């Protein structure tokens, strides 16, 4: 793939025709631990009964902090009044467009500060836990020193519905952030593209399945 190719079109195309995990809706609100201190899931439900159940499950898993990266809704007041979890809202739209490097800066700086305390457990979610949340988690893992493909593999292993389409933006941000030159940026992006080509998911199927079976 040339450096001038449309990376996001490539990812969305490769994610549109391949693997379909069984019962993806069962993963929507599942607590998926990437490390003992870093988790992913789907966003807090707008149904208060379901939302209270989610918060109870999160607290049982040790979650102390929650970064919500979905723009659709802000449940900060509900979380504050129904749990002891600290809520941080860093929502962005899931429009398939390029992620602003400043967003990755904000997510990772917030996460790293939280994770300085070894007793903290951080939850990161978007709404479905398919793209924005896993991509933000991927950026945090890079900032923690993880190798790029290992981070992608671990995210997919613990959350099989994680398409993580903004991972190319994340790795580009990270290489530049750490002083990499244009050649290093191209190499890192190509490695992420290759990983997605070798590990495709049917993103459209996942989103339809979760939405139609849960009312998301």
Language-model region placement:
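PTP/DSP superfamily signal
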Residues: 2-18, 105-122, 128-130, 135-216
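Acidic, metal-coordinating catalytic cores used for nucleic-acid/nucleotide bond scission
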Residues: 71-73, 96-97, 128-132
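Short acidic, glycine/proline-enriched helix-loop-strand junctions
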Residues: 28, 35, 43-45, 74-95, ...
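Glycine-rich, flexible N-terminal cofactor/catalytic loop recognition
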Residues: 33-75
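Class I SAM-dependent methyltransferase core
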Residues: 68, 124-125
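Amphipathic coiled-coil/heptad-repeat helices and related helical stalk/stem segments
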Residues: 24, 50-52, 107
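Mobile, glycine- and charge-enriched loop segments
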Residues: 2-47
